[in-house]
Design a protein with these regions (language model features):
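C-terminal segment of classical bacterial N-terminal signal peptides
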Residues: 18-22
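Short coil/turn linker and secondary-structure boundary residues
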Residues: 1, 38-39, 47
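N-terminal secretory signal peptides and thylakoid transit peptides that target proteins
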Residues: 1-14
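A generic secondary-structure boundary signal that marks alpha-helix termini
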Residues: 15-16, 159
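N-terminal pre-domain segments of enzymes
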Residues: 30-40
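Boundary at the C-terminal end of the N-terminal hydrophobic targeting segment
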Residues: 25-27
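A short Gly-Trp-Pro
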Residues: 35, 44-78, 84-165
């Protein structure tokens, strides 16, 4: 009997978490809220399945799977959905989390919202131009900001700094 109650409680908790996450995502995907708006079909044609899952469905890539986590060359990290420059490589640091991390975004490049999924409250980070989900920001980063913008690498594209001749 106790095992059955525990199983039902676990299933109920998981369903509630999915419901809360789904409700939050729908409210943020309201058409006309961002400069760049597209239908789901347009996004699916433009993005890879992994990019679509993260940017449009608020997914998370598996830790340690993004090659961008280990790139420290000079350049800019832009939104994979709309090419808006989001982070400078000068603010990137090794957070040892398995995701590209930065201590500050480029000014006016991102937006944030409250994410109450998975039984906790976090600050979700999205592209201010297309609304694509990028990751979350935490208050355990290095100086000078003390913030850690923990980004999904699949939501970003790295643009190397052009060498002057």
């Amino acid at each position: 009997m106790d095992r059955r109650i525990l199983t039902l409680a676990g299933i109920s908790a998981a369903a509630l978490g999915l419901f809360m996450r789904s409700d939050r995502g729908a409210a943020e995907s309201t058409p006309g809220k961002f400069e760049i708006t597209k239908t789901d079909e347009e996004w699916k044609k433009q993005l890879t399945p992994e990019q679509y899952y993260v940017l449009r469905k608020h997914g998370t890539e598996r830790a340690g799977t993004s090659p961008l986590d280990k790139i420290y060359a000079p350049g800019t990290y832009a939104c994979a959905g709309c090419d808006l420059p989001l982070f400078s490589s000068t603010t990137k640091f090794d957070s040892r989390t398995g995701w590209p991390s930065f201590y500050a975004p480029i000014e006016k490049a991102i937006g944030t919202s409250v994410d109450k999924s998975f039984f906790t409250t976090r600050t979700e980070v999205h592209c201010r131009r297309c609304g694509g989900h990028l990751g979350h920001v935490f208050d355990d980063g290095p100086k000078p900001t003390g913030l850690r913008y923990c980004m999904n690498g699949v939501a970003l594209k790295f643009l190397p700094e052009k060498k002057s001749s």
